């Protein structure tokens, strides 16, 4: 009997459709259940419809987020508990949560369940239960930690009253633990009883006040300092020591306005009997902030007055060194010849790599000898790819053999400078043979390999949860579970498992999670894993399209000269393939466009743009991002170094850097002397990623650098 293949295929398709329809229905139920429970909590009637909620949860059998639904119901019931709730109900709910934990001991939600029991016991005002529970589970939030300490103090007081004791060792231990929280936090919730007990026990000493002030100062917490200085206002008869209060006010003032430092530092400090200067930390820590209030172009920067401060305030040699490094960093580019001479002498003396590297970059764009600065680097600094490259270039004329040796070794590594080394070794072909030390691409193990079958079975429920959360566009929670999954894999070959799962993520088009997984696995040599071919068809469409051209900028919207590998390299560097990425400057989406840039580009290229939300949509973002790259390509034809610099830092800054270079710098010199650390690294990464993407896209004769990049003077 031969199987009817068409019949079997039809059955399979029908089953798939049935499963998909069931999933859609369950998804709708899940979302409606969440809304019902939200309303029930608001109306304080969760318990009135328990059967309804349980039936809805039961209907979610085999739905990946059924456990989330159960958790939402548990949370709603916890919120409904008060001190008037019968203790039997509280115990029953606690037991129910503990059963869920026992049945799912390794689930991502375990911590939420465990912490939920704290909230349950706090809401129920179950002092004894709270203390006992805290002995085996650690409370995570400050609010819960304080609640536990309050409960312990209450039990201890009851016990002492029964035994007619004044204090006990347990009492002292509670207050000691409270003190650690007080020292580490500017404000604590619901700590009135603990604070009063701690204060009445004489624990709020001047040493403790200054210890906390120093911590607040390090955190730049002016509000916390204000709270500390007014802390005794809560006690009618108490008054802060005048000197302490004056110092706390001074610390607050310094945090708000570092320019006032001389008012404190110019005075001779008060040295206490133990030879301690209690306000010293404020002077030490404010100095770098104070320097930022001074003009970098002041007539003649002079460190001598600050050396006098350092002497008066008894700074250690290490602290003076940090001050001098900060001073040099602030005025580094000052044009005063006396300062420059002193700066160079001090850099050679201090041997601080951050200053030495900055001086090296200055020497590169000024085209002066690098040797003294290369020699001043630490051993670690000299081993960086960048400085090995410049060492080779510096000695090229006098020792070609050594130069070739350095460049050859460098060309067997990954990165921008290895790629540059390969180009130097083979200038005619632009280093076309560069293979970053990997003649063959390292392929990550696949989770679908039979070898991983048991592991896949174990993690599949978590992967299904992640898939469903992403379907619901809950990308943040999905990423949290992804990281939890990868970081908590058990057994041997953890890195291989992490890589296999990252490969799986890329296969599911979870490109941001695939990249994230490759970082967690430290799979730096696995280029295919680190640089997935993401949203490939969108880039094809965007780069083939020719939007209407602006009359004022006839070339502005032409995408034809922007390569797919370059556009993808920019995206990978900008967002690590996270469509929801948002920077502190409000750049958004895959290609991290500012709304203002997006609007201007859309107007110029005649592209649709409805507002900021569009930038979180991959296709919209790619259309606008590639159009903006095309605008920059029109300005800097086929020069990815200038395009990438402008994309990151703005074209106005690129023009400024080109004006400084004045047509005298070679490509490597221009890149090394880009003043912004972020932009310098950005350009190097983008060009390297572009080369890798050309290989991954199987481009014939992948190009390291174009003629426009390599042959011109900048």
Residue spans of the language-model regions?
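Hydrophobic/aromatic side-chain positions at a characteristic register within alpha-helices
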Residues: 25, 37-45, 61, 78, ...
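Catalytic glycan-binding domains that act on GlcNAc-containing polysaccharides
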Residues: 304, 308, 312, 348, ...
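Alpha-helical adaptor scaffolds
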Residues: 74-75, 114-119, 324-333, 342-379
């Amino acid at each position: 009997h031969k199987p009817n293949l068409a019949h079997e295929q039809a059955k399979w398709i029908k089953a798939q459709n049935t499963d998909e329809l069931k999933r859609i229905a369950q998804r709708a139920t899940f979302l409606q259940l969440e809304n019902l429970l939200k309303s029930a909590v608001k109306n304080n009637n969760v318990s009135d419809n328990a059967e309804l909620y349980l039936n809805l949860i039961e209907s979610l059998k085999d739905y990946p987020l059924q456990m989330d639904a159960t958790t939402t119901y548990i949370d709603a019931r916890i919120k409904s508990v008060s001190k008037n709730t019968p203790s039997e109900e509280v115990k029953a709910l606690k037991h129910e949560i503990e059963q869920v934990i026992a049945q799912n001991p390794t689930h991502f939600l375990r911590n939420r369940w465990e912490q939920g029991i704290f909230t349950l016991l706090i809401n129920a005002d179950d002092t004894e239960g709270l203390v006992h529970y805290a002995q085996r589970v650690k409370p995570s939030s400050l609010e819960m930690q304080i609640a536990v300490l309050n409960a312990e103090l209450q039990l201890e007081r009851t016990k002492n009253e029964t035994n007619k004791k004044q204090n006990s060792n347990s009492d002292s231990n509670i207050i000691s633990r409270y003190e650690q929280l007080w020292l580490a936090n500017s404000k604590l919730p619901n700590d009135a009883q603990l604070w009063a007990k701690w204060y009445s026990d004489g624990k709020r000493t001047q040493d403790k006040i200054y210890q906390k002030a120093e911590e607040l100062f390090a955190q730049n917490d002016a509000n916390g300092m204000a709270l500390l200085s007014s802390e005794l206002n809560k006690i009618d008869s108490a008054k802060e020591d005048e000197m302490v209060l004056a110092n706390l006010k001074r610390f607050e003032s310094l945090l708000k306005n570092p320019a006032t430092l001389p008012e404190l530092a110019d005075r001779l400090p008060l040295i206490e009997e133990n030879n301690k200067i209690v306000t010293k930390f404020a002077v030490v820590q404010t100095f770098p902030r104070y320097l930022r209030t001074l003009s970098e172009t002041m007539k003649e920067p002079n460190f001598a007055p600050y050396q006098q401060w350092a002497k008066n305030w008894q700074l250690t040699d290490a602290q003076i060194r940090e001050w001098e490094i900060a001073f040099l960093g602030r005025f580094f580019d000052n044009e005063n010849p006396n300062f420059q001479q002193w700066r160079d002498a001090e850099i050679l003396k201090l041997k601080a790599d951050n200053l030495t590297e900055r001086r090296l970059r200055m020497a590169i764009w000024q085209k002066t000898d690098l040797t003294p600065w290369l020699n001043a680097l630490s051993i670690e600094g000299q081993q960086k790819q960048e400085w090995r490259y410049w060492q080779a270039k510096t000695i090229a004329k006098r020792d070609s053999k050594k130069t070739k040796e350095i460049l050859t070794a460098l060309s067997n590594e990954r990165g921008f400078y290895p790629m540059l080394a390969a180009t130097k070794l083979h200038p005619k072909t632009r280093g076309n043979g560069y293979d970053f030390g990997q003649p063959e691409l390292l392929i990550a193990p696949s989770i679908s390999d039979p070898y991983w079958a048991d592991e896949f079975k174990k993690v599949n429920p978590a992967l299904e949860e992640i898939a469903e959360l992403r379907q619901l566009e809950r990308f943040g929670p999905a990423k949290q579970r992804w990281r939890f999954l990868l970081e908590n894999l058990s057994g041997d070959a953890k890195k291989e498992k992490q890589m296999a799962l990252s490969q799986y993520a890329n296969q599911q088009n979870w490109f941001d999670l695939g990249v994230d997984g490759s970082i967690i696995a430290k799979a730096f040599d696995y280029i295919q894993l680190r640089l997935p071919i993401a949203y490939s068809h969108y880039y094809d469409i965007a780069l083939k399209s020719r939007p209407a051209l602006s009359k004022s900028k006839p070339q502005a919207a032409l995408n034809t000269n922007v390569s797919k590998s370059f556009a993808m390299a920019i995206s990978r560097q900008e967002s690590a393939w996270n469509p929801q990425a948002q920077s502190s400057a409000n750049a958004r989406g895959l290609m991290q466009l500012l709304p203002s840039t997006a609007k201007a580009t859309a107007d110029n290229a005649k592209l649709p743009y409805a507002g900021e939300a569009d930038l979180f949509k991959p296709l919209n973002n790619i259309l606008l991002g590639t159009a903006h790259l095309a605008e920059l390509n029109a300005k800097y034809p086929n020069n990815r170094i200038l395009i990438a610099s402008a994309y990151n830092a703005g074209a106005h800054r690129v023009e400024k850097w080109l004006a400084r270079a004045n047509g005298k710098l070679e490509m490597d010199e221009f890149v090394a002397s880009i003043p912004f650390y972020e932009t310098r690294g950005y350009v190097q990464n983008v060009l390297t990623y572009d080369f890798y993407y050309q290989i991954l896209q199987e481009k014939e004769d992948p190009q390291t650098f174009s003629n426009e990049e390599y042959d011109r003077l900048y």
